[in-house]
């Protein structure tokens, strides 16, 4: 059987993985086997946390809108319900930014909804 020397291809593959985990501590950045496991774990965490970030930001936006709505005397739930009944589909990210950066504008939006005729 002919001898196969993998030469630079194997070295290139290992270097790529070691470069990926270069920020790790100890053997995880030096030894190929542990580095390979660390890379797999990092990719799993990155994939999971991309979804988690979306959930966390939505929770933050809802909290901010709730605080601003309660400052005007209505809960978040009622405020969103009124928006839907007026067929104003809320973008929570934008509403949260308005609530934080320009509370007068949020109050204007809030006061333009007539709560009596809906509820």
Swiss-Prot record:
Gene Ontology BP, a term: ribosomal large subunit assembly
Function: Binds directly to 23S ribosomal RNA and is necessary for the in vitro assembly process of the 50S ribosomal subunit. It is not involved in the protein synthesizing functions of that subunit.
Cellular compartment(s): Plastid, Chloroplast
NCBIfam families: rplT_bact (TIGR01032)
GO cellular component, one term: chloroplast
Protein name: Large ribosomal subunit protein bL20c
Homology family: Belongs to the bacterial ribosomal protein bL20 family.
Keyword Plastid set for record: yes
Lineage: Eukaryota, Viridiplantae, Streptophyta, Embryophyta, Tracheophyta
Keyword rRNA-binding included in the entry's annotation: yes
HAMAP family on file: Ribosomal_bL20
Single GO MF annotation: rRNA binding
Main location: plastid
Organism annotation: Pinus thunbergii
SUPFAM superfamilies xref list: Ribosomal protein L20
Pfam families: Ribosomal_L20
CDD domains according to UniProt: Ribosomal_L20 (cd07026)
Gene3D superfamilies the UniProt entry points to: 6.10.160.10, Ribosomal protein L20 (1.10.1900.20)
Keyword annotations: Chloroplast, Plastid, Ribonucleoprotein, Ribosomal protein, RNA-binding, rRNA-binding
Entries under InterPro entries matching the protein: Ribosomal_bL20, RIBOSOMAL_L20_CS, Ribosomal_protein_bL20_C
